[in-house]
């Protein structure tokens, strides 16, 4: 969060203005981070994307769920892969509606803090129900549970924005 956040700033729109002004720096930093990790990211993703029945779920809590809603159709049409967007609240309340143990799964989790209880629970449920489950959390918080769990796991790769 920007250092000048206060409830008063949020109420007056200063918070929103700061978030908007922060975007160019944030995108450049994110692209630099991804560029530095490109080889390792490709090494993680390439074998997964070759799996015939791979299911890819884009998920997040609240506004982070909208990311998946926006990009899943484009990714599916441009890659021919099985992408779907499922909010973490849906995954947590009805996991068997979305998690098929017969197919490998790549769960791409979006979360600014990486600490929302439903995001962490979605990862745990995916691991519990899908024997061949992989994770790609994309978060802004290296201290968050999504990031920390991924960097300490053999079946995950984490991206820090």
PLM feature segments, named:
Residues 1-51, 158-161:
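Cofactor-/ligand-binding subdomain signature composed of acidic, glycine-rich
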């Amino acid at each position: 969060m920007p250092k000048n956040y206060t409830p008063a700033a949020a109420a007056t729109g200063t918070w929103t203005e700061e978030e908007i002004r922060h975007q160019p720096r944030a995108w450049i930093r994110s692209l630099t981070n991804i560029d530095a990790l490109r080889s390792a990211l490709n090494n993680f993703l390439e074998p997964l994307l070759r799996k015939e029945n791979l299911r890819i779920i884009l998920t997040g809590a609240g506004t982070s769920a909208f990311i998946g809603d926006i990009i899943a159709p484009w990714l599916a049409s441009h890659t021919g892969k099985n992408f779907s967007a499922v909010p973490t609240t849906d995954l947590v309340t009805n996991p068997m509606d979305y998690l098929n143990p017969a197919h490998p799964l790549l769960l791409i989790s979006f979360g600014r803090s990486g600490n929302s209880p439903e995001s962490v629970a979605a990862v745990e449920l995916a691991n519990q129900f899908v024997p061949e489950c992989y994770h790609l959390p994309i978060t802004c918080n290296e201290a968050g549970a999504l990031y920390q769990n991924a960097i300490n796991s053999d079946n995950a790769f984490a991206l820090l924005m």
